[in-house]
């Protein structure tokens, strides 16, 4: 990728400075990632994946999962994959996956919002081999709405000030007690997450 020239020093521990900055949001994020996040590889790269409930998880749409994915280095079959669009067929940049595994995810639907949320203090949590166990205070999150994301008109975008880099997609945007969205891109100095809304995971879907 664009950052292959970077040295391969991997900080394994989240820094305490960030913990102090964030307090409860940071603690919530660490607990959420420990229980519900995994590192996933598709043929399009490596991503952070968040498990939502039962055997359903979410990835950025551009991860384009195939019939199977590597989840924490284990091959796992994908039984179903839905690319989300709004009622007008506009891209929402999220793919919901149903995994072929016995273990169920802890149900976190109660932490998802019913509509796009703006907050003053958020944390972006990433866990991949390039960015292991990384928690970044991104401050204020605003409801950006419509964005042309890499040439694709995309809706329900949340924006924050953060110099994003390739390889952080799938990162989980959180505030205290809330899972706000999934990081899907950036323009160098702003990051964008797809709002992760509760009704995407209604049983009837």
Curated annotation (Swiss-Prot):
Active site: 62 (for protease 3c activity), 93 (for protease 3c activity), 169 (for protease 3c activity)
Molecular function terms from GO: cysteine-type endopeptidase activity; RNA binding
Modified-residue entries (O-(5'-phospho-RNA)-tyrosine), positions: 3
E.C. number: 3.4.22.28
Residue numbers marked as site, Cleavage: 22-23
Keyword Repeat: no
Keyword Coiled coil: no
SUPFAM superfamilies cross-referenced by the UniProt entry: Trypsin-like serine proteases (SSF50494)
Coiled-coil segments: none
Keywords assigned by UniProt, alphabetized: Autocatalytic cleavage, Capsid protein, Covalent protein-RNA linkage, Host cytoplasm, Host-virus interaction, Hydrolase, Magnesium, Phosphoprotein, Protease, RNA-binding, T=pseudo3 icosahedral capsid protein, Thiol protease, Viral attachment to host cell, Virion, Virus entry into host cell
InterPro entries: PCV_3C_PRO (IPR044067), Peptidase_C3A/C3B_picornavir (IPR000199), Peptidase_S1_PA (IPR009003), Peptidase_S1_PA_chymotrypsin (IPR043504)
GO CC list: host cell cytoplasm; T=pseudo3 icosahedral viral capsid
Enzyme class: hydrolase
One annotated GO biological process: proteolysis
Residue span(s) of domain Peptidase C3: 23-201
A Pfam family that the UniProt record links to this protein: Peptidase_C3
Family: Belongs to the picornaviruses polyprotein family.
Identification of the protein by name: Genome polyprotein
Source organism of the structure: Echo 9 virus (EV-9)
């Amino acid at each position: 990728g664009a950052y292959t020239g970077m040295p391969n020093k991997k900080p394994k521990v989240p820094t305490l400075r960030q913990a102090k900055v964030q307090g409860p949001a940071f603690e919530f994020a660490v607990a959420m990632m420990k229980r519900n996040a995994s590192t996933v590889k598709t043929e399009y790269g490596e991503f952070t994946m968040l498990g939502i409930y039962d055997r359903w998880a979410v990835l950025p749409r551009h991860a384009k999962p195939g019939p199977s994915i590597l989840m924490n280095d284990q091959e796992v079959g994908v039984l179903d994959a839905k690319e989300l669009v709004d009622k007008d067929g506009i891209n929402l940049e999220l793919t919901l996956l149903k995994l072929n595994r016995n273990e169920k995810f802890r149900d976190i639907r109660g932490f998802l919002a019913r509509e796009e949320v703006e907050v003053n203090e958020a944390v972006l949590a990433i866990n991949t081999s390039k960015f292991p166990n990384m928690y970044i205070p991104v401050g204020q999150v605003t409801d950006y709405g419509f964005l042309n994301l890499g040439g694709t008109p995309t809706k329900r975008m949340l924006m924050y000030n953060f110099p994003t880099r390739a390889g952080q997609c799938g990162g989980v945007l959180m505030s205290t007690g809330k899972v706000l969205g999934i990081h899907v891109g950036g323009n160098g100095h702003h990051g964008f997450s797809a709002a992760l809304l509760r009704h995407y995971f209604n049983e009837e879907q």
